[in-house]
Amino acid sequence: MDVILLQRIKNLGKLGDKVSVKAGYGRNFLIPQGKAVAATEANTAAFEARRAELEKQEAEVLAAAQARAEQLNEVNIVITAKAGDEGKLFGSIGTRDIADSLTNAGLTVDRAEVRLPNGALRHTGEFNIAIQLHHDVVAEVLVTIVSE
């Protein structure tokens, strides 16, 4: 099944690409979610008429993400947690804890945007945490974990 993508989809394509996908993926996920339309002649013509509008929306989302990234790059947060003598935490600091700390600092960050590639943080110290705001925009936040 051929579809025209209405937004960037990881491992598939970007806005305006005409791609071939399995029929079930197109019918049951992409089209109902509004991420793609079937690549008929009528839809192709309608998409070309809306292309500028969709690209403008995409540019606005990117600009907003870049503005948020500039704010986040300047932020350092301190999280206190119970820890043993050697700096090992009783428990761990995960994406929710980091997102909540950033929200308490006055920034809106969803826990799904926080990237912890090595899993939850289990030791005291300073960590550079990546915040994926957009597929092209990643902010770095310095998180310091101190013992209570």
Curated annotation (Swiss-Prot):
An annotated GO cellular component of this protein is: ribonucleoprotein complex
SUPFAM superfamilies linked to this entry? L9 N-domain-like, Ribosomal protein L9 C-domain
Task: Kindly give the Pfam families that the UniProt entry links to this protein.
Answer: Ribosomal_L9_C, Ribosomal_L9_N
GO BP: translation
Keywords noted in UniProt: Ribonucleoprotein, Ribosomal protein, RNA-binding, rRNA-binding
**InterPro entries, per the entry:** Ribosomal_bL9, Ribosomal_bL9/RNase_H1_N, Ribosomal_bL9_bac/chp, Ribosomal_bL9_C, Ribosomal_bL9_C_sf, Ribosomal_bL9_N, Ribosomal_bL9_N_sf
Among the GO molecular function terms of this UniProt record, one is: rRNA binding
Task: Give the family from UniProt.
Answer: Belongs to the bacterial ribosomal protein bL9 family.
Matches recorded under HAMAP family: Ribosomal_bL9 (MF_00503)
| NCBIfam families from the UniProt entry | L9
- Could you tell me what this protein does? Binds to the 23S rRNA.
What is the name attached to this protein's record?
Large ribosomal subunit protein bL9
Q: Name the gene that codes for it.
A: rplI
